[in-house]
Amino acid sequence: MNLMAERSLENAVGEKMNATASSIKMRGEKVCVFYGEKQALFDVDLDIPEKMVTALIGPSGCGKSTFLRSLNRMNDTIEGCRIAGRITLDNEDIYDPRLDVVELRARVGMVFQKPNPFPKSIYENVAYGPRIHGLARSKAELEEIVVTSLQKASLFEEVKDRLHDAGTGLSGGQQQRLCIARAIAVSPEVILMDEPCSALDPIATAKVEELIDELRQNFTIVIVTHSMQQAARVSQRTAMFHLGNLVEVGDTEMMFTAPTEKRTQDYITGRFG
């Protein structure tokens, strides 16, 4: 290979490495989580790529939800919980004492296992976040945010004639999409989803899964799921947890067809879990 070709190859490799580095939205480094004296996570190193869906899988109690909650400091609300290691968002340490946790949770939104709409109207459920964060300068701007968020959550057409009805009056699947619209409304960069379909029927689950695929065009998504089929359908990256350890992480297709770790193979094939 001549010198020009070598330099061209080096430049191409360098550009690829830079692109890869810049595409990491969040990063966990040696993350350990303790509940009192009990250690729930052990030295977890995990990168969350930008504008992709990363699925966290593993048996109950493996630490996947604990790690998820660490990504926007929801574990701060649990008495006796402490974290060691480092988690960054755009290379900024989210556990820096100077960091505004309210602002962090606006940037890293959360959708919980059970739909939890506020006891307010559909409109007010979505308008609440933008209003308290000062994202709308007028009533018209606020209305635009509400409508756009409901559209992005694939819910607007179903509720446009009853925006002032109670959000709690919607079906379970609609309530979950309302919660997703509520998260979207404050313009997050990352959306965390903790088993968002576990309380939904198959039809509602399919709608939420379609929505997740659409949302990844604009948002980085991390989802905890017990459903191997769901992880395979919606994610591009999968991380396997077991007994508080990150066992393996990789492209979803490779993880489900040719995992390198026996524990991953055994879990995916139903030998334990």
UniProtKB/Swiss-Prot annotation:
NCBIfam families: 3a0107s01c2. The lineage of its organism: Bacteria, Pseudomonadati, Pseudomonadota, Alphaproteobacteria, Hyphomicrobiales. ATP binds at residues 58-65. It is an enzyme of class 7 (translocase). Its EC number is 7.3.2.1. Belongs to the ABC transporter superfamily. Phosphate importer (TC 3.A.1.7) family. Its main location: membrane. CDD domains: ABC_PstB_phosphate_transporter. The complex is composed of two ATP-binding proteins (PstB), two transmembrane proteins (PstC and PstA) and a solute-binding protein (PstS). It is found in: Cell inner membrane. One of its GO terms (cellular component) is plasma membrane. It catalyses: phosphate(out) + ATP + H2O = ADP + 2 phosphate(in) + H(+). This is Phosphate import ATP-binding protein PstB. It is a peripheral membrane protein. PROSITE patterns: ABC_TRANSPORTER_1, ABC_TRANSPORTER_2, PSTB. Keywords: ATP-binding, Cell inner membrane, Cell membrane, Membrane, Nucleotide-binding, Phosphate transport, Translocase, Transport. One of its GO terms (biological process) is phosphate ion transmembrane transport. Residues 26-268 form the ABC transporter domain. InterPro entries: AAA+_ATPase (IPR003593), ABC_transporter-like_ATP-bd (IPR003439), ABC_transporter-like_CS (IPR017871), P-loop_NTPase (IPR027417), PstB-like (IPR005670). It comes from the Bacteria. GO terms for molecular function: ATP binding; ATP hydrolysis activity; ATPase-coupled phosphate ion transmembrane transporter activity. Part of the ABC transporter complex PstSACB involved in phosphate import. Responsible for energy coupling to the transport system.
